[in-house]
Amino acid sequence: MGKYYCDYCDVFLVSESPSVRKAHNSGRNHLTNVRDYYSSLGHDKAQSYIDEITRMFETGGGNSTSNRGPGGNPPGSQPGPPNAGMSGPMRPPFSNSTAGPNMPPLPPAMLALMNGQNGMSSPGSGPPPMRFAGPPIPNNMPPGMMQPPHVNGYSSGPLPPQPQPASGGQGAPPLTARMNPDRARQLG
């Protein structure tokens, strides 16, 4: 039996995957059940639910402990643990002080590399850090990071080749330097 229960339809979904929930929530029967539920509440009660949900999103989440039916504990059921399902995304088992309040913590291998360690750890502490092949990057930049452009608009290294004027003394149009040579010949 699936772990996702739809209060509006009074059914357990077969799978707990987001795609199954999305398909269920966009289904004709579910939409009809939602419409019927809120129309049976009356305008004032439905508007109070909408306002409460809007307030929760504006304040960054939170948990209303009121027993409100769909979205909360079903009427007549026993309440679950505080903040069950409403506390936001689950945090990974590792945590550190380098992550900001809205940033996920860094994995231990990344912390080891940032602290200058070689990334080797004791058995059972997780996979070794990824190693990147290739030539060393100037300015001690980490692999995969682009270097900032210089004043002339190019990154470090030699300047790109400049277009040479044709032997007849005429200069090539400026776009030919970026154009395929065959295409440039066709254009004349």
UniProtKB/Swiss-Prot annotation:
Component of the spliceosomal U1 snRNP, which is essential for recognition of the pre-mRNA 5' splice-site and the subsequent assembly of the spliceosome. U1-C is directly involved in initial 5' splice-site recognition for both constitutive and regulated alternative splicing. The interaction with the 5' splice-site seems to precede base-pairing between the pre-mRNA and the U1 snRNA. Stimulates commitment or early (E) complex formation by stabilizing the base pairing of the 5' end of the U1 snRNA and the 5' splice-site region. It comes from Puccinia graminis f. sp. tritici (strain CRL 75-36-700-3 / race SCCL). SUPFAM superfamilies: beta-beta-alpha zinc fingers. GO terms for molecular function: mRNA binding; pre-mRNA 5'-splice site binding; U1 snRNA binding; zinc ion binding. Residues 109-124 have a biased composition (Low complexity). Residues 57-188 are annotated as: Disordered. Belongs to the U1 small nuclear ribonucleoprotein C family. A zinc finger (Matrin-type) spans 4-36. InterPro entries: Matrin/U1-C_Znf_C2H2, Matrin/U1-like-C_Znf_C2H2, U1-CZ_Znf_C2H2, U1_snRNP-C, Znf_C2H2_sf. Pfam families: zf-U1. One of its GO terms (cellular component) is commitment complex. The lineage of its organism: Eukaryota, Fungi, Dikarya, Basidiomycota, Pucciniomycotina. It is found in: Nucleus. GO terms for biological process: mRNA 5'-splice site recognition; spliceosomal snRNP assembly. PROSITE patterns: ZF_MATRIN. Keywords: Metal-binding, Nucleus, Ribonucleoprotein, RNA-binding, Zinc, Zinc-finger. The keyword Repeat does not apply. HAMAP family: U1_C (MF_03153). U1 snRNP is composed of the 7 core Sm proteins B/B', D1, D2, D3, E, F and G that assemble in a heptameric protein ring on the Sm site of the small nuclear RNA to form the core snRNP, and at least 3 U1 snRNP-specific proteins U1-70K, U1-A and U1-C. U1-C interacts with U1 snRNA and the 5' splice-site region of the pre-mRNA. Residues 72-82, 125-141 have a biased composition (Pro residues). This is U1 small nuclear ribonucleoprotein C-2. It comes from the Eukaryota. SMART domains: ZnF_U1.
